[in-house]
């Protein structure tokens, strides 16, 4: 953008601020609140101008966000809100998305550290894998680089974790199905060396024993993908289940496909509950009953914690768990048992 007087005035008018404030945002000098900066940047975007280049500007931290594949809508949702929240706080994001067989989380981490990243956010990463080597996280703490994790609390990781209450979500889903008269309930979830999947399986086992006296509940472990869940659902149909709780919305969609392919109906023959409440789940036919992850609340708290560390030069090198309560969203994929 050419910072002539006319364009600066346009932006100032659009944002409801003075031209001097716009100039401070462009030049990275002076005191500008995060909210005012956001309004100025929004005005720049809406008017079609180029944003000021952030490199070299003071008080503009660069935050690395490492997420799994964005083809899973829940990870796309986390990424969207993280980028929005970091931008609102006056930072710049470097987003690294993993895909199977491509660049790994720790490869991304090495590259970001070389770029002198100011802080890091890991979403459902290796920190959530009970089989993973956690040394890179310890190295981050030793370097004094603040970071937080999302959805995968492990006490060995020296950073705060912000996660959905998986156990409460599963308990809520089972209770809903029991109220509908179901007793042949199965859990279709992820591999239990992944912390959220383990929490779901543990909660399912406990609540089925408490409420039904079932000490050997039906649990199918597989990958958190549409295809893997579709394949595993055949076994659940063969075992005569009347309801399936999936560990993710993608798994729920895979289960529904297999149920339909078998000539059965959701929810008339088999009820299905998802987990995430990701984008478009309310627009399916039938709309998916699911456990809603409080993504925005998790993101807001995680980013606030990271920025507090950046502001105080505290390195967050102590583990802490922050658990956020999920909600059951009842839609059309569950019904009374026959």
Features from the language model and the residues they span:
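Short acidic capping loops at alpha-helix termini that bridge into adjacent secondary structure
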Residues: 183-184, 214-217, 266-271
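N-terminal helix-turn-helix/winged-helix DNA-binding helices
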Residues: 3-7, 41-80, 89, 100, ...
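N-terminal helix-turn-helix DNA-binding module of bacterial transcription factors
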Residues: 1-59, 338
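Hinge/beta->alpha junction and helix N-cap segments in small-molecule ligand-binding domains
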Residues: 35, 67-77, 95-104, 126-129, ...
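Short, well-structured alpha-helical segments in soluble
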Residues: 104-117, 227-239
């Amino acid at each position: 953008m050419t910072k002539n007087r006319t364009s600066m005035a346009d932006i100032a008018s659009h944002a409801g601020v003075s031209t001097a404030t716009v100039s401070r945002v462009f030049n990275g000098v002076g005191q500008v609140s995060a909210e005012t900066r956001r309004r100025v940047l929004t005005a720049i975007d809406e008017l079609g101008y180029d944003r000021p280049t952030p490199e070299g500007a003071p008080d503009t931290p660069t935050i690395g966000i490492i997420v799994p594949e964005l083809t899973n809508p829940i990870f796309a949702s986390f990424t969207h809100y993280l980028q929005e929240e970091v931008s609102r706080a006056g930072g710049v994001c470097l987003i690294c998305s993993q895909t199977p067989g491509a660049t790994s989380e720790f490869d991304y981490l090495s590259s970001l550290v070389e770029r002198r990243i100011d802080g890091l956010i890991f979403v459902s990463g290796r920190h959530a894998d009970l089989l993973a080597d956690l040394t890179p996280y310890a190295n981050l703490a030793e370097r004094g680089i603040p970071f937080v994790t999302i959805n995968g609390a492990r006490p060995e990781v020296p950073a705060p974790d912000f996660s959905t209450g998986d156990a409460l979500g599963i308990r809520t889903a089972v209770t809903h199905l029991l109220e509908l008269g179901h007793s042949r309930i199965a859990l279709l979830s992820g591999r239990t060396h992944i912390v959220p999947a383990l929490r779901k399986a543990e909660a399912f086992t406990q609540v089925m024993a408490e409420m039904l006296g079932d000490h050997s509940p039906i649990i199918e472990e597989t990958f958190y993908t549409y295809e893997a869940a579709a394949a595993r659902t055949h076994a659940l149909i063969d075992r005569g289940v009347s309801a399936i709780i999936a560990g993710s919305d993608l798994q729920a969609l895979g289960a529904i496909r297999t149920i339909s392919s078998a000539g059965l109906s959701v929810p008339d023959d088999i009820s299905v509950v998802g987990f995430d409440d990701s984008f478009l789940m309310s627009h399916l036919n039938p709309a998916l009953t699911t456990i809603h992850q409080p993504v925005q609340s998790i993101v807001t708290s995680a980013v606030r914690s990271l920025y507090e560390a950046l502001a105080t030069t505290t390195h967050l090198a102590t583990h802490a768990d922050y658990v956020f309560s999920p909600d059951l969203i009842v839609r059309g994929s569950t019904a009374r048992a026959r």
